[in-house]
Regions:
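Predominantly soluble domains enriched in secretory-pathway, periplasmic, or organellar proteins
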Residues: 3-5, 16-354
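Cleavable N-terminal export/targeting peptides
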Residues: 8-11
Length: 354
């Protein structure tokens, strides 16, 4: 996933929009359902943003910010009040290993910090272009993902040393661990799911999804029933629901426009996707063979990533408001429509729940 710079963040407007608007509110109404936006916190500050990470045990929310004053901002997960900042960390994503209490962010070099004190411990040289990041609790290893080779750099969370780099066979987007020694990675440019032996660090299979969609993005995992939820943006946005053990496709369902990151909540048996068009879609797993779209909730345009708070079952997402683009503004990344400058202090964190 590409980090969103402040000038080129995409606004995906409904085709039938009658009155032009450049603020962050989504233009489509919410469907009925149990979820709503519980709280909106105006965090403000300049700089782009990308991933968000929730540390449920420590009750902290991490949001890296870009721009001239790149930093890692830290918030109270319950109140959304600021609790600290790690300066000079302009990253796409962040993660914390719950065993060592070491945090990592996808700067280049990768920054490693003490999650208790927010003090930088060291930097770690890596190749490629660090983007996504996650901790595999199976063996306390941090996976740094890159669209450029090497596609994955695996770091020991305790020592901060690089264990190995991997070629995943294409550009990775979101990855998930089954907690038992297997990692699954949505390969964006190949329309497949890479299956990786997380102990021996070797790719063992690729599940081909090209018949269902291209432009892979989010990936979520139901550990109880061994089910993957793989999201694709083209030709129309869908989630492909897959048997994780053999790659067999169970079914597909529609999603909103511009899915980026997703999560599966085992407490509610729901796969949830954040969508750049200003919505959040909840897929209900009624049984291992029965799935349905439970709700599409209005959030904010640009709120395309999320984090799950496993203690409260709340979802956290974020977005900002933007002015109109200049007449000569160039398209954003991947041909996205141009966007104007960020409205000062409009950056907001949204808490979603029942």
């Amino acid at each position: 996933m590409q980090r969103i710079p402040p000038i080129f963040l995409t606004v995906v407007l409904a085709a039938a929009l009658a009155i032009p608007s450049f603020v962050g509110l989504a233009q489509n109404p919410s469907s009925s359902g149990p979820y709503k936006v519980l709280k909106t916190a105006k965090a403000g500050g300049e700089g782009g943003y990308d991933y968000v990470f929730a540390d449920g045990k420590a009750r902290r929310l991490y949001i890296p910010r870009g721009g001239q004053t790149g930093r890692l901002t830290v918030f109270n997960l319950d109140t959304l009040e600021s609790v600290g900042t790690i300066p000079n960390v302009s990253a796409g994503g962040a993660t914390v290993d719950p065993k060592s209490h070491h945090g990592f962010s996808t700067t280049k070099p990768v920054t490693m910090w003490d999650a208790k004190t927010l003090k930088v411990i060291k930097t770690i040289d890596v190749e490629g272009r660090p983007d996504g990041i996650l901790t595999d609790a199976y063996n306390s290893r941090v996976w740094v993902l890159s669209h450029q080779p090497p596609h994955a750099t695996i770091i020991d969370a305790r020592s901060g040393t690089v264990v190995k780099t991997l070629d995943l066979g294409g550009a990775p987007e979101q990855a998930v661990s089954n907690g038992r020694g297997t990692m699954y990675v949505n390969i964006a440019d190949k329309a497949n799911i890479a299956v990786v032996d997380a102990k021996n660090l070797a790719v063992t299979a690729h599940y081909d999804m090209s018949s269902k969609g291209t432009g892979g993005s989010g990936l979520a995992f139901d550990a109880k029933n061994h089910i993957l939820f793989a999201y694709y943006r083209q030709p129309s946005p869908v989630v492909v629901i897959i048997n994780a053990d053999n790659g067999n496709i169970i079914t597909t369902l529609p999603t909103g426009t511009g899915v980026d990151t997703v999560a599966f909540n085992p407490a509610t048996m729901e796969a949830i996707s954040a969508e750049n068009g200003g919505s959040m879609t909840f897929i209900k797993e009624n049984s291992p063979t029965d799935f349905s779209v439970e709700q599409t909730l209005q959030t904010m345009v640009g709120a395309k990533t999320l984090a799950l708070d496993t203690k409260t079952n709340h979802l956290l997402t974020m977005a900002a408001e933007y002015g109109p683009p200049a007449p000569d503004a160039k398209p954003g990344p991947a041909g996205r429509p141009p966007r104007g400058p960020m409205i000062a202090d409009s950056f907001s964190i949204l808490m979603v729940g029942k």
